[in-house]
């Protein structure tokens, strides 16, 4: 079928769009690599269970990657570099075809054209996030055959193009539930829309206006520095104002901030896709139970023998379900949560599902599922939970991968209003109060309003709001502080984990008093078939170091001592055990993935690695 036939038909053009989406759902793509902890870790907020290993998986999280990593690439091209480039090429063909043959006065064709610009921009932004400087190819290879060997390009060229393309995408695509959106895409969080395009523009702009690890010259294979992407402060101010404008357009159109912080994650886990019911602006869609292992990699760990016994007992856990417990939150983040912050107990859990036939840990009935308390190093990320699913997972869970939500728009607006940490303050022409946007997020978390905006406040709020959502690493990178913050997180962790008793330690210019003991009780949850859940946990907040007055071991309360580790020496935090990184000097040099060797070999000299790879 020729291009004229395809791109003069709205129905066939949508099939071409679906072909671009399909590339995001392949092995070693978002279903089990890019959405599953192989990127984005370790940070000051999240760390990986693989950090202790020496295999190729561990190098993806400890800043020690090599150019022949088999965990994320293989020589047959089945990897994220190939898939993202294919998304770009398919979108190039759609854009060229619709521009040449399509009727862009037709609402559906305008929408599909805008969605192609949006998907291409997303793929390019992901490539810049993962690899830094990559080839820029904005025309289909059929139009420009020589571009098959496109040369590595300065990322600023791509950023400049994304500014144009995402504004065009936002112009062409209506709001998600607008009548002009084709019915197959209308009100679907898994399809492009104006708000998602504007939010992605703001995200890309903040990266562009910020800092990055950059080679001294594009051709320099070894020398690099952390610096601004460009020196023109007038341009930086213009871009910050573009962020304000883009975010304001979304904020003024709709209030999508969920009342309950857990709601966006419950909805993702329960297959909600209605845009007007969700805080998320866009998520990569996967077929239910057919593709995707988001739950298996991102949920709290369940032991291999327990998960078999729990099948059919806990909602969401079916035969063959997996739970790797890949991501835990760091103590450095845990003790930054203010008293009463509702986000803490959604973001992490102090226990993991187990199945016990012997009635231990205060359980008076046998053959029940229960949450088993764990040590501090295993406080797992908990935004993705089997018990929130509406169907049972049998391995490929098919949970959609969320990309951006409304809270990010609010906090990006607040950040841009003060110029982030660039020293450049833009003119706010939107009539929106940036402090109010940040305080909307704090109020939802159950916290008092902040009195004034500052970069430190922005940095802390983004940590507590977005941990585990594959955002933090790139925040730290664009602020130019990843190395400093990861080293701080390790020093703090080392300072508490080598102890066995409660202590007072410095944290971000303040002192926190940390308990070595937690107290909790169990309650039965009828929604979980009577499973026992840890409840009323005390001892994780600053100053919670003495037994609560209401503690009564005769009334179901339990005391877990020394959450740091063994009774003798606390948690053995030797470099071979759970490091954040292998070598401190590599924290800048290995922020980006290398271009894999087989692509360089086949590039006719147009690809190479920087940063001393």
Regions found by a protein language model. Name each.
Residues 121, 201-203, 398-446:
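Extended amphipathic alpha-helical segments enriched in small hydrophobics
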Residues 1-61, 134, 138, 159, ...:
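An aromatic- and glycine-enriched ligand-binding surface/loop that stacks and positions planar moieties
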Residues 97, 127, 134, 208-215, ...:
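Glycine-centered coil turns and helix-coil junctions that link the paired helices
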Residues 84-87, 161-163, 185-188, 268-302, ...:
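Long, intrinsically disordered, low-complexity segments
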Residues 62-64, 332-405, 605-613:
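Flexible, polar/acidic helix-loop-strand segments at domain edges
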Residues 102-113, 213, 238, 421-433, ...:
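Structural helix-adjacent loops and short alpha-helical linkers that scaffold large soluble proteins
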Residues 106-119, 190-198, 453-455:
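Alpha-helical scaffolds flanking conserved acidic
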Residues 9-10, 14-18, 22-28, 32, ...:
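Conserved, well-structured interaction surfaces
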């Amino acid at each position: 079928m020729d291009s004229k036939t395809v791109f003069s038909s709205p129905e066939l053009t949508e099939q071409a769009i679906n072909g671009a989406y399909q590339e995001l759902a392949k092995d070693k793509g978002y279903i089990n690599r890019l959405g599953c902890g192989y990127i984005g870790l370790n940070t000051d907020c999240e760390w990986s269970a693989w950090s202790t290993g020496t295999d190729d998986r561990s190098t993806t999280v400890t800043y020690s990657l090599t150019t022949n990593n088999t965990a994320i690439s293989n020589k047959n091209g089945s990897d994220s570099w190939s898939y993202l480039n294919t998304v770009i090429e398919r979108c190039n063909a759609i854009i060229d075809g619709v521009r040449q043959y399509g009727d862009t006065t037709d609402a559906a064709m305008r929408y599909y054209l805008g969605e192609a610009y949006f998907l291409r921009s997303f793929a390019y932004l992901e490539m810049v996030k993962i690899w830094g400087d990559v080839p820029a190819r904005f025309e289909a290879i059929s139009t420009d055959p020589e571009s098959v060997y496109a040369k590595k390009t300065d990322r600023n060229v791509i950023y400049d193009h994304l500014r144009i393309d995402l504004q065009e995408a936002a112009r062409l695509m209506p709001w998600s539930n607008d009548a002009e959106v084709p019915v197959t895409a209308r009100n679907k969080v898994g399809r492009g829309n104006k708000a998602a395009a504007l939010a992605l523009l703001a995200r890309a702009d903040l990266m562009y206006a910020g800092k990055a690890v950059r080679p001294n010259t594009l051709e320099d294979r070894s020398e690099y520095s952390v610096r601004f992407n460009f020196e023109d402060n007038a341009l930086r101010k213009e871009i910050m104002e573009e962020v304000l404008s883009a975010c304001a357009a979304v904020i003024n159109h709709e209030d999508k901030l969920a009342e309950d912080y857990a709601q966006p994650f419950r909805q993702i886990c329960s297959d909600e896709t209605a845009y007007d019911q969700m805080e998320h602006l866009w998520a990569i869609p996967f077929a239910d139970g057919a593709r995707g292992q988001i739950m298996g990699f991102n949920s709290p760990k369940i032991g291999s023998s327990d998960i078999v016994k729990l099948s059919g007992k806990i909602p969401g856990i079916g035969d063959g379900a997996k739970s790797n417990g890949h991501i835990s939150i760091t103590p450095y983040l845990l003790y930054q949560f203010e008293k009463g912050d509702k986000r803490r107990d959604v973001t992490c859990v102090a226990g993991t599902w187990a199945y016990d036939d012997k009635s231990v840990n205060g359980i008076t009935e046998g053959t029940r599922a229960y949450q088993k308390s764990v040590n501090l190093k295993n406080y797992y990320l908990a935004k993705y939970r089997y018990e929130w699913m509406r169907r049972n997972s049998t391995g490929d869970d098919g949970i959609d991968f969320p990309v951006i939500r409304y809270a990010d728009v609010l906090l990006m607006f607040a950040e841009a209003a003060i110029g982030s940490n660039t020293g450049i303050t833009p003119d706010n022409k939107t009539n929106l109060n940036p402090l109010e946007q940040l305080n909307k997020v704090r109020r939802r978390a159950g916290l008092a309003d902040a009195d004034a905006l500052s970069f430190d406040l922005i940095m802390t709020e983004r940590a507590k709001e977005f941990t585990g959502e594959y955002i933090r690493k790139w925040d730290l990178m664009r602020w130019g502080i990843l190395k400093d913050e990861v080293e701080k997180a390790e020093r703090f962790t080392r300072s508490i984990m080598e102890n066995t008793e409660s202590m007072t330690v410095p944290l971000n210019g303040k002192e926190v008093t940390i308990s070595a003991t937690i107290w909790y009780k169990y309650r039965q949850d009828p929604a979980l078939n009577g499973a026992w859940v840890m409840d009323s946990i005390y001892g994780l907040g600053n100053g919670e170091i003495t037994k609560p007055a209401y503690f009564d071991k005769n009334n179901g309360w339990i005391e877990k001592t020394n959450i740091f580790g063994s009774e003798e020496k606390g948690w053995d935090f030797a470099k071979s055990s759970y490091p954040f990184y292998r070598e401190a000097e590599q924290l800048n040099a290995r922020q980006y993935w290398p271009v894999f060797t087989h692509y360089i070999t086949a590039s006719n000299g147009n690809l190479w690695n920087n940063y001393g790879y």
